[in-house]
Amino acid sequence: MERTFLMIKPDAVQRNLIGEIISRIEKKGLKLVGGKFMQVPMELAEKHYSEHEGKPFYDKLISFITSAPVFAMVVEGENAVAVSRKIIGSTNPSEAAPGTIRGDYGLNLGRNIIHGSDSTESAQREVKLWFTSSEIADYKEPREDWLYE
């Protein structure tokens, strides 16, 4: 099974959307295998968003992601990266389809509720950056027999 990294951002945490977001992810068949509620240290934020360093929005992004707690998680399932990206919706909430997390809850590009790895390579890098192997559970849910052929 494929794993991916998701992070419920400060705007969603402050709006009490953690449970709703996790529920949507689980209802789609993805399994939560790691999760932690945390204040993001500056160093971790800079490593996570290193690809954006030097861009006009970088400082604001780092400031935002370290401003309040986030809920970081690892989810697992068949095509987890693609499935989670579809549930999340377009990066810009004004372009996200209704029924997606960002389409329903996102306010603008800077307050877009959730981060999701954009590729299997990014997912592997981000999972390793945010979680140790001991923080990720390896288990089987009874529903898996009903979800996958």
From Swiss-Prot:
Active site: H115
Single biological process term from Gene Ontology: GTP biosynthetic process
The keyword rRNA-binding appears for this protein: no
UniProtKB keywords: ATP-binding, Cytoplasm, Kinase, Magnesium, Metal-binding, Nucleotide metabolism, Nucleotide-binding, Phosphoprotein, Transferase
Disulphide bridges, residue numbers: none
Localization per Swiss-Prot or TrEMBL: Cytoplasm
Main location: cytoplasm
Cofactor(s) listed in the protein's UniProt record: Mg(2+)
Enzyme class: transferase
Reaction(s) catalysed (UniProt annotation): a 2'-deoxyribonucleoside 5'-diphosphate + ATP = a 2'-deoxyribonucleoside 5'-triphosphate + ADP; a ribonucleoside 5'-diphosphate + ATP = a ribonucleoside 5'-triphosphate + ADP
Entries under CDD domains matching the protein: NDPk_I
A GO CC term assigned to this protein in UniProt: cytoplasm
One Pfam family here: NDK
EC number: 2.7.4.6
Sequence positions that bind ATP: K9, F57, R85, T91, R102, N112
SMART domains: NDK (SM00562)
GO MF annotations, alphabetized: ATP binding; metal ion binding; nucleoside diphosphate kinase activity
Biological function: Major role in the synthesis of nucleoside triphosphates other than ATP. The ATP gamma phosphate is transferred to the NDP beta phosphate via a ping-pong mechanism, using a phosphorylated active-site intermediate.
Subunit structure: Homotetramer.
PANTHER family (UniProt xref): NUCLEOSIDE DIPHOSPHATE KINASE
Family note: Belongs to the NDK family.
Database matches in NCBIfam families: PRK00668.1
Protein name, per record: Nucleoside diphosphate kinase
Organism: Staphylococcus epidermidis (strain ATCC 35984 / DSM 28319 / BCRC 17069 / CCUG 31568 / BM 3577 / RP62A)
